[in-house]
Every structure is written in structure tokens, then in C-alpha cells.
């Protein structure tokens, strides 16, 4: 069912699935707490009442903290009240967060006590913020209000009156290069992106939400789409406990980024090499019910699609960007093309100009908040310049070849996509992470090796082994695509919140 505002999604879910579980989370080691769709709607309405009573309706309100029921209610209430939500990356330093709060003109801050340092820093430097709400405190304090206290003090229904084209979220990009930008998304941008595609997912599907909740992919697909379908959204409390939480919550589906999938792939490859039976191994690693993993955010080795299929798990590779709310395309369970990032969403069209993919549709952002120059560079006559190189086939499936801004132009004028070379080499298990770039006139590969794999494989001289892999690649590569310099790292590359490697 197609929706055009976020309050419409929640109201529908309340009517259709009121008594069913909406959100589950771990209360203690093996104890699960839950809230129904009716409870979610009632708490959202009550907190929206509180926002209006505090005089913050229509203003910009930031939310910061790990994934939690309180975070979800806060976001839904902000958007229901006609205010503008500003989700913040909880892993950033307090000083960086305060800069984002100022840039986004935030007037109210809702925070998890795990980041109480942000509230303290903001109180000193963000003078426009005059309301602070703690998600965890049980009582109101002079300087900080209690989330639960506000809900209890403002119980009652709320009648949202929000326009489809109203700004409802400013979401800062976690770009791999340059200054983060505040992407302006409307009610219709987010609601339609989450609900325009029927992926044949039935109600009561159990989803384990493992990605950072401030990230567009998680917010759209786990939370908004999940609510619209009457799913049971289970909150993963830590990436370190993800394997245990899979066993605890027994999900049907999980959204992951490729780095997570690669970790599981290594386990499956070990199992396959040992000749162990697939079904008991699948249950041990993925629980009794997991059947689908949705992947997005970066390149995924297409061979993993076949590997996971051997264990009864479907991988659906997708593609998107925050500026498109975020999903642009996805593979479908009944029509998987493993070398493609999927079929265009039904509310989206695409074309290529000079090799760059441009998209247009109802999911495309309004622009970057208070950054007109960058907006003009990215949006042209409604077309969003993705910065990605690729093409669309006759069936509407997208194939990506690299990033325009990363393109290497050789001395003889040849264009080389570093991603193409990275993908070709990263299939080798010795290479854990890789960046290809131009350095002093030649193509260089900087590699973080998998030392555990090297030890298990009896590789003593890692550098020589890596050089041998590059030499093997160079034999079949055109001269202008050959790698002539190798740099070996001793630590992982720095990454964004969505687990993309920062290229500079």
C-alpha cells in the first residue's frame, strides 16, 4: 500500500495490526521486552502532544543515541507533529555534533544518556537549543526533561495535519570525502520511498535491525517499511552481539552492509570447504528462520549471492543514496541479477549523461540545507546527479562501474575506475580492505590484509603474497589499468557510520 506521509503509515499500522508486536528489544541477557502497534501509536501521539506543548511544533529537533524504542518514538512524534527531525550519528565527537546542531538550526535535543556529553557540550555552545530531553531519565530535572515523563504528562490522541511536501527530516550524509551535507527530505520523499514497492513481504515478518538507526537505509527500510507491513522490528543492541541476537530474536530478514555479509561469508566458505551439511550450519549461524538478507551501501561481491543461496538464504542487493530517500533500486526475490544493484524503484527513472547515472522521481530530495551552491551542482531540472558511473539495461536494472569523483585519468588520457580494480582484487581472501588510487603518476593499491587468513593459510610473507596477487592481476589487465605500486597497511581504513571506507 502506497503512503505519502509518515503519520499515514503509523495510523494504518495501528488500525491493521494494533494488538500485534511492533518493536522488540533485549531487556536483559535472554529477556525480550516489546510494544504493540497500538502502544507505539499511543506513545507517539503523547510525545507529539508534548512537542506541541513545549512550543516546538514546526521547529528542528535533533535525536541522538543508539537504536532504541525511545529513538523510534521520538522520530515518529517529531514528524507527526509537523516538526523537522534531525537524526545525528551517535558515534561522532561531541564537538562535531554541536557543529551539525548549529548548521541545522536545532532548537530541541533528544538524547540517550550514553551521549550525555553531547547535551553538556550543546548547553555551552549551542545557544539556540533551550529544551533537552533524556530518553533514559525517569524524572524531570530543571535543565533536562524526562522522555517517559513527557509521555505520561501528555497522554492522549494527536491528530496530525502535515502536508506531503512538508520538510520532515534533515539527514546529514556520512560522505567518504568532503564536508557532510544536510539532505532535506519531505514527508512524501520518505513515505513513498518506503512503501512504493511491493517486495512480497507478509505481515509479522521478523526483522533484526542492525544498522545505525540515524542512517537513511535503516530508517526507511527497517523502520518505515517495517511499520507499513506490520513487521516485528527487533533492535540489535550491539554489532558485537549480533550473532547472539540472531539466535535470540530468530529473524526472517536482516538489512546489512557488505562488510557484515563478508564476515558471514568467510564462515560459510569454511563450512563449505570442510564439507559440512548446509542446513544445521545455517541454523547455527543464522537461526531457525532467516531467509533473506538485503544489502546496500557499497559494492557486494556477486559470488556471495550464490554462496548464501547454497545455505538457503537469498541476498537482495540494492542501491541508493541519502539524497534519494534513499532507495533507488533493488533486486527482487523472484528476479535476481547478481551483477546488478537491482531494478529501478517504480517511482524513479534514470538516464546516463557522460557515463554518470542521473535519477529523477518523487524520492529525490529538496536539496542541501543552507547549501545552495552544492544543491545546484547536484540537482538539475529535477535530475539528481548520483556521481556514480554505470548504465541501465532494457529491463530497468542498474549496473554500476565506479564513482565519477574517484576516476583516475592516466598520463595517456585513459579513464580508470578504481572500484573496478578494487572489486577484481578483493575476491582474494588475503585482501580484507583495499583502496586503488593514483600516486606519483602510477596506479597504486593500498591494502589492509587479513592476517588471520594469512596465518591459517601458512602465509609468512604477506607483502610478497600480495605482490604476487597484483602481478597475477596485471598479466591479464590492459597496460593502462595495471597496478605499479603497493602499499600495505597495518590497520583498517577509517570508515563512515555506514561502514564505507573514507577515501581521503
State each model region's role.
Residues 433-436, 440-441, 471-504:
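Conserved C-terminal "lid"/linker of ANL adenylate-forming enzymes
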Amino acid at each position: 500500500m502506497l503512503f505519502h506521509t509518515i503519520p499515514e503509515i503509523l495510523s494504518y499500522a495501528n488500525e491493521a495490526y494494533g494488538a500485534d508486536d511492533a518493536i522488540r528489544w533485549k531487556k536483559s541477557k535472554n529477556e525480550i521486552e516489546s510494544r504493540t502497534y497500538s502502544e507505539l501509536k499511543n506513545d507517539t501521539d503523547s510525545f507529539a502532544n508534548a512537542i506541541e506543548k513545549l512550543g516546538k511544533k514546526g521547529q528542528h529537533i535533533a535525536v541522538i543515541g543508539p537504536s532504541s524504542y525511545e529513538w523510534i518514538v521520538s522520530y515518529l512524534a517529531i514528524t507527526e507533529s509537523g516538526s523537522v527531525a534531525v537524526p545525528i550519528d551517535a558515534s561522532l565527537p561531541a564537538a562535531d555534533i554541536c557543529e551539525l546542531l548549529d548548521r541545522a538550526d536545532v532548537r530541541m535535543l533528544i538524547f540517550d544518556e550514553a551521549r550525555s556529553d553531547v547535551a553538556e557540550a550543546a548547553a555551552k555552545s549551542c545557544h539556540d537549543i533551550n529544551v533537552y530531553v533524556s530518553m533514559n531519565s525517569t524524572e524531570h530535572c530543571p535543565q533536562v526533561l524526562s522522555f517517559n515523563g513527557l509521555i505520561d504528562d501528555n497522554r492522549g490522541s494527536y491528530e496530525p495535519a502535515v502536508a506531503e511536501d512538508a520538510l520532515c527530516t534533515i539527514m546529514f550524509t556520512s560522505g567518504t570525502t568532503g564536508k557532510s551535507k544536510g539532505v532535506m527530505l519531505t514527508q512524501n520523499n520518505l513515505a513513498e520511498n518506503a512503501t512504493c514497492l511491493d517486495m512480497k513481504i507478509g505481515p509479522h515478518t521478523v526483522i533484526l535491525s542492525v544498522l545505525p538507526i540515524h542512517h537513511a537505509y535503516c530508517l526507511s527500510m527497517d523502520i518505515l517499511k517495517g511499520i507499513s507491513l506490520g513487521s516485528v522490528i527487533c533492535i540489535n543492541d550491539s554489532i558485537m552481539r549480533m550473532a547472539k541476537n540472531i539466535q535470540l530474536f530468530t529473524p526472517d530478514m536482516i538489512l546489512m552492509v557488505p562488510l557484515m555479509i563478508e564476515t558471514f561469508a568467510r564462515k560459510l566458505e569454511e563450512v563449505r570447504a570442510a564439507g559440512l551439511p548446509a542446513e544445521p550450519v545455517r541454523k547455527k549461524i543464522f537461526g531457525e528462520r532467516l531467509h533473506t538478507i538485503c544489502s546496500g551501501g557499497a559494492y557486494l561481491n556477486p559470488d556471495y549471492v550464490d554462496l548464501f543461496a547454497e545455505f538457503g538464504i537469498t541476498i537482495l542487493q540494492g542501491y541508493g543514496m541519502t539524497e534519494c530517500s534513499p532507495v533507488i533500486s533493488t533486486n527482487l526475490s523472484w528476479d535476481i541479477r547478481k551483477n546488478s544493484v537491482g531494478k529501478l524503484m517504480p517511482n524513479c527513472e534514470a538516464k546516463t549523461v557522460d557515463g554518470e547515472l542521473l535519477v529523477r522521481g518523487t524520492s529525490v530530495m529538496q536539496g542541501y540545507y543552507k547549501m545552495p551552491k552544492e544543491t545546484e551542482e547536484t540537482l538539475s531540472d529535477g535530475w539528481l546527479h548520483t556521481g556514480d558511473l554505470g548504465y541501465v539495461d532494457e529491463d530497468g536494472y542498474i549496473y554500476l562501474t565506479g564513482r565519477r569523483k574517484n576516476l583516475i585519468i592516466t598520463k595517456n588520457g585513459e579513464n580508470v575506475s578504481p572500484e573496478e580494480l578494487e572489486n577484481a582484487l578483493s575476491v582474494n581472501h588475503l585482501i580484507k580492505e583495499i583502496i586503488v588510487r593514483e600516486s606519483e603518476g602510477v596506479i597504486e593499491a593500498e591494502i589492509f590484509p587479513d592476517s588471520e587468513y594469512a596465518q591459517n593459510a601458512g602465509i609468512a610473507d604477506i607483502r610478497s603474497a600480495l605482490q604476487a596477487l597484483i602481478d597475477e592481476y596485471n598479466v591479464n589487465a590492459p597496460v593502462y589499468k595495471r597496478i605499479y605500486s603497493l602499499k600495505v597497511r597495518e590497520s583498517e581504513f577509517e570508515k563512515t557510520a555506514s561502514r564505507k571506507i573514507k577515501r581521503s
